[in-house]
Amino acid sequence: MSFNASTSDWAGYLANEPWAGYVERVKQMPASRWAILALVNAPVLAILFNALWQKIAPRKATDPPVVFHWLPIIGSAIWYGNDPIGFFQTCQERYGDVFTCILLGRKVTVTLGVKGSNFVLGGKSTAFNAEGAYTHLTTPVFGKDVVYDCPNEVFMQQKKFIKFGLTTKNFPRLREDDRGRGGRIYAQGPKEKEVREGLNKSFSQLYSDLDGGFTPLNFLFANLPLESYRKRDRAQKKMSDFYVDIIKRRRANPDAETHYDMIESLKEQTYRGGAALRDHEIAHLMIALLMAGQHTSTATLAWTVLHLASRPDVAAALYQEQVERFGNADGSFRAMEYEDLRHLPVLDSVIRETLRVHPPIHNIMRQVREDVPVPASLAAPSSKSGNGVYVVPKDTYVLASPIISQLDPRIWVNAHTWEPSRWSDSAGVAAQALRTYTDEAGEKIDYGFGAVSKGTESPYQPFGAGRHRCIGEQFAYLQIGTIVAALVRRVELRLPTKVPEHNYHTLILMPKDPKSVHYRRRRFD
């Protein structure tokens, strides 16, 4: 049918159309068509309603500002998951240091900056609970009755037991074997050998399967009918049995040649009530020690090697320090001892700068067990919203992100640049941040695992702060320093590309691909 676009023609055309039958046709539409329409339109309506509700819903004056999000339930999870640092920095500019975001149905209040970290990490465990935030992730991997699968006061005692086994008197046992070109690093002693001999290829596979339980998916869902979850559970059982068998053999033969290792140390420990650690608790603590320490050290080593390969000048200074301190007349090197690490400023600066730019854990979360007011010095409602304070409500979550302070250009010069020399300036920001973090001359707090500096008010917190500060901090410096020194003694490093960006799709902050490093041996034996 042809017609022109005049008003009279349109009126005649529309008058002849059977509009009255339209309703009847809709009524006769099959149910499958209705289902398709509902399936297509329901998400759109949900998104529109969610956006509208955020604009018109009444909000308490004490509620922190909420990050606008289009997708209900999912909230800001996609943006946060792909680029948490960019997400936090953008929200910080828009909302300030305190704001709330929705992450897959969880209401999470983020507190940024030095004061924000102090608010969360320095808070009381009765208010900010780590167990509620992480037990669903750690318990299937570590095992029952340890770490976050027990009351906080019990966990603090367990940290004390492990810390006792990691005292500096045991550090000299870790040293480099220079008798072969491999330069292997290991702990000495017959009973450590008993454990090492069990670390064969099958154990490596168990470790890999158990490591598969430390992913963002596992953080979101503790149990799913997936093969990776089944492998995780089987590996946890076999690895636990491995350690329990060693413990039982030692208990059955107490007169055998002994050497002080971590298992032996844990066997001697007792809780405050006098109860000794049970065999499965020792086994699960050994798994926790293995898994927790390996991830963070591996990440730090990877970033250190990448940066040394990209900065030949720093690598050369590091090598020269090794020559001056440990070089022999024939061009070889003597082995490093623990005390030597205290006198290697270049190596120390390299490790500290790597931890500043690439802290293994960039976000720390807690479950809120009671309503907690936010200090006005951190953030407060504007005069238009009221004269009170923000309150983080019970049964939600709080999140601190120390990396935001560690990369804050208002604190650090060239904040995003890896520059170890900043740590050699005794009057600089880095040295001051380190003094605040270690606070060697200040007041110490005993959270239950020995007196430590609080460290929550420093802009540099690579090992956490407060009651959950990492107890393996000194051991990590020893381990990383020994491996880096062994590496630069043997090879020259070059990076064919730029230093990779952060991979935020892993729980630990690892580099993205490609991350290949070229090397050349310094000498051939």
Model-found features: residue ranges?
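N-terminal membrane-proximal hinge/A-helix region immediately C-terminal to the signal-anchor transmembrane segment
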Residues: 2-144, 148-157, 164, 172, ...
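Cytochrome P450
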Residues: 3-43, 102-109, 170-184, 190-201, ...
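Cytochrome P450 heme-binding "Cys pocket" and the immediately downstream C-terminal segment
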Residues: 312-314, 455-469, 473-511
